[in-house]
Regions:
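Glycine-rich phosphate/diphosphate-binding loops and the adjacent beta-loop-alpha structural elements
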Residues: 1-7, 11-26, 31, 91-92, ...
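Glycine-rich phosphate/pyrophosphate-binding loop and the adjoining helix
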Residues: 1-4, 168-174
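Short coil/turn connectors at secondary-structure junctions
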Residues: 2-5, 43-46, 60, 83-84, ...
Length: 174
């Protein structure tokens, strides 16, 4: 079904360091991206998976590129996306990173540290915005207004397709 196609997929969370010990992340397991990669490889596609830190076995027949931060994922994707037929952005990439990370572990004190955050680069929008962009699939993890938010993301980022997931509550997760 997918023989001859080149597919680039992202999966898992990213981690944005605060200091050498602590980081900001999310609850993404990476399972969706890994299963999509497995299915594409079984279908005959040439698959590259750019993965954040997960506890999952590597899919057979898939080239896995391991990254940690949103910036590392951005660079890994943009360095590889040229020549791919399909891009599937299943990763839960951090929206923010810490402006100034501490080189040493921050000690607990009576005064809580204040973290200044900055927006990370939007991998999905950048891929979809390429002059010769691959067929681009995005994911929308939403706690409310699932359909409206997914449609807005589809249009705003000029995606070819979006997969909407209800998260939060007892049954919603990723």
């Amino acid at each position: 079904v997918m023989a001859g196609l080149c597919v680039l997929i992202t999966a898992g969370p990213t981690r944005e360091p605060i200091d050498p010990v602590r980081y900001i992340t999310n609850r993404s397991s990476g399972k969706m991206g890994y299963e999509v990669a497995r299915a594409a490889a079984r279908g005959g596609a040439s698959v590259t998976l750019v993965s954040g830190p997960v506890c999952l076995p590597k899919p057979d027949g898939v080239v896995v590129v391991e990254i940690e931060t949103a910036d590392e994922m951005y660079r890994a994707v943009m360095d590889r996306v040229q020549g791919h037929d399909i891009y599937i952005g299943a990763a839960a990439v951090a929206d923010y990173s810490v402006v100034e990370t501490s080189e040493r572990k921050m000690k607990k004190s009576d005064v809580a540290p204040q973290l200044l955050l900055t927006l990370t680069r939007d991998i999905l929008a950048n891929v979809a915005g390429l002059e010769q962009s691959p067929f681009t699939v995005g994911f929308a993890a939403e706690t409310d207004d699932l359909e409206a938010n997914a449609k807005q993301k589809l249009a705003a980022k000029k995606l070819d397709m979006i997969v909407a997931n209800q998260v939060g509550g007892e049954e919603g997760g990723f």
